[in-house]
Amino acid sequence: MNLYNLVRDALRPSYATVSPSVDEPTVDNNFVALSCYATLSVLLYYLQRVKQPYLSMLFHILFCLSQVCMVIWLIFSANFYVSLFAQCMLVVCALGCFLERTILSIKLRSMAPFMSMADNFAIIKTTCNNYVFPVERSSDNLVVLTTSRGIYSNGVFMKGAITVSDNALVVSLFKSHSLLLDRVEHGYDYTVFIYINSVILQNIKPTVSVVNTEFTDVEL
């Protein structure tokens, strides 16, 4: 009897029990990628403003690469409208950057805007020629060093004449202003000219310990 039951159970078709399916939570890969891109872009945007020039250049290159990768990813998107928008955005940005550099080049009469991504440029006149230097961070501080080999401006060297006029013209895309240079040091074969904004040398908020108000303003 037991053998009969075993054979019968073996020949009987077995029906699999279907358990109620539970939907696993899915993560949208596009949302994760866009979140990482936004976080990385904001982080690199502020990191490229560090004072160390090599680190600033490195972060600036990484920031540009991240933007290029995002645009390429959007161009090859499966959505036709997203891809078309990315391609149009790429063309508009390229034309805008080229137009900005071209206008600066015409105003400066120099090809310096195509060699540097600076927003401000200083025109320094010498006895023989005019020299264009990029002003990376601020036009409020400008140091000019002339030697027998050439001229330095904020760390950028160019071969040229020694004698420099007492002013420099700082040109940007929408405005330009003249800076009066002061000769602070003179040696055998070098001269140092410097310009510092008067606001930097002024105590706007005097401390409590200052009693006499005559000493709140500091002049160069």
Swiss-Prot record:
CoV 3a-like viroporin CD domain span: 120-200
Question: PROSITE patterns, from UniProt?
Answer: COV_VIROPORIN_3A_CD, COV_VIROPORIN_3A_TM
Keywords attached to this Swiss-Prot or TrEMBL record, sorted alphabetically, are: Host membrane, Membrane, Transmembrane, Transmembrane helix
Q: Check the record and name the InterPro entries matching this protein.
A: a/bCoV_VIROPORIN_3A-like_CD (IPR046446), a/bCoV_VIROPORIN_3A-like_TM (IPR046445)
Domain annotation CoV 3a-like viroporin TM: ranges? 17-116
Q: Which residues cross the membrane?
A: 27-47, 56-76, 80-100
Task: Give the superkingdom in one word.
Answer: Viruses
Keyword Transmembrane helix in annotation: yes
Entry's localization field: Host membrane
Q: What membrane topology does this protein have?
A: Multi-pass membrane protein
- Gene Ontology CC terms, in alphabetical order: host cell membrane; membrane
Chief location bin: host cell
User: Does the keyword section mention Transmembrane helix?
Assistant: yes
- Protein name from the UniProt record: Non-structural protein 3
